From Swiss-Prot:
EC number: 2.7.7.38
Protein species of origin: Rickettsia bellii (strain OSU 85-389)
Biological process (GO), any one: CMP-keto-3-deoxy-D-manno-octulosonic acid biosynthetic process
Gene transcribed to yield this protein: kdsB
Main enzyme class: transferase
HAMAP family, A to Z: KdsB
GO cellular component: cytosol
Keywords (A to Z) from UniProt: Cytoplasm, Lipopolysaccharide biosynthesis, Nucleotidyltransferase, Transferase
Family label: Belongs to the KdsB family.
Nucleotidyltransferase is among the record's keywords: yes
Nucleus listed as a keyword: no
Main location, first listed in the record: cytoplasm
Name of the protein this chain belongs to: 3-deoxy-manno-octulosonate cytidylyltransferase
General function of this protein: Activates KDO (a required 8-carbon sugar) for incorporation into bacterial lipopolysaccharide in Gram-negative bacteria.
Pathway assigned to this chain's UniProt record: Nucleotide-sugar biosynthesis; CMP-3-deoxy-D-manno-octulosonate biosynthesis; CMP-3-deoxy-D-manno-octulosonate from 3-deoxy-D-manno-octulosonate and CTP: step 1/1; Bacterial outer membrane biogenesis; lipopolysaccharide biosynthesis
Length: 244
């Protein structure tokens, strides 16, 4: 089995401010977290875990044969939850790379996850994250994040504003991160930064502290479910696509 030194962790907290019991909302006959897990599981990696504070979520995943790690409800961010889960993986001294896949992307493509892993292993970046080329009309919503990169694909800045200003085509940031273990350990030890708090983007903590984030280009923007409107969009996509 490939990538024995990689763990994929899906943080999934039951409480959500904008969509009640978000991970357990149905898209067709399956819950949101089920769909995320099934997509991630298609990578065929051995070390795939859902990190949660909820027995209900754990039961859903365990019925699918998945592995669950319980984490505290009060952990502030998905990345912090990812690290807490990583520390509880048996024999984690053999894990050198950790991929954080957000638990709100029910149609995330396994190919995108594998591309992040390959690019991380084949580079010297601390972190690798996927981006998608999109037109201006596709990224107007405030919940969407764009990224400016240098000529080699290294991230310069992330923003909820459209960057670079005046462009017609942008790089949409997909909320998934591949970390070297040392980078994840360093991240959680750092205090939140000014830009991070201003933009409400935790990846800016990395940039403000001199860490490097590489980007890898993927084909499709995955639907992220944060609001009732997002859930409706996901249900319509599911029905149109005739997914199982």
């Amino acid at each position: 089995m490939k990538h024995q030194d990689v763990a994929i962790i899906i943080p999934s907290r039951l409480s959500s401010t904008r969509l009640t019991r978000k991970p357990l909302q149905l898209i067709g006959s399956s819950t949101l977290i089920e769909r995320v897990f099934k997509q991630v599981n298609q990578t065929n990696l051995e070390h795939i875990y859902v990190a949660t504070d909820s027995q209900e979520i754990a039961s859903v995943i365990e019925k699918l044969g998945g592995k669950v790690i319980f984490t505290d409800s009060n952990i502030p961010t998905g990345t912090d939850r990812t690290y807490e889960a990583f520390k509880l993986i048996p024999n984690n001294q053999n894990i050198n790379y950790i991929v954080n896949v957000q638990g709100d992307m029910p149609f995330i493509e396994p190919e995108s996850i594998l591309k992040v892993i390959e690019d991380l292993k084949n580079s010297k970046y601390d972190i690798v994250t996927p981006v998608v080329k999109v037109e201006k009309d596709s990224v107007e919503a405030a919940s969407n994040v764009t990224v400016a990169i240098d000529s080699k694909g290294k991230a310069i800045y992330f923003s909820r504003s459209l960057i670079p200003n005046g462009a017609e085509e942008f790089l949409y940031h997909v909320g998934m991160y591949g970390f070297r273990k040392s980078a994840l350990e360093r991240f959680v030890a750092l205090e939140p930064t000014f830009l991070e708090k201003t933009e409400r983007l935790e990846q800016l903590r990395l940039l403000e502290n001199g860490m490097t984030i590489g980007t890898c280009l993927v084909n499709n923007v995955p639907i992220s479910v944060d609001t009732p409107e997002d859930l409706s969009k996901a249900v319509k996509f599911y029905e149109k696509s005739k997914l199982v």
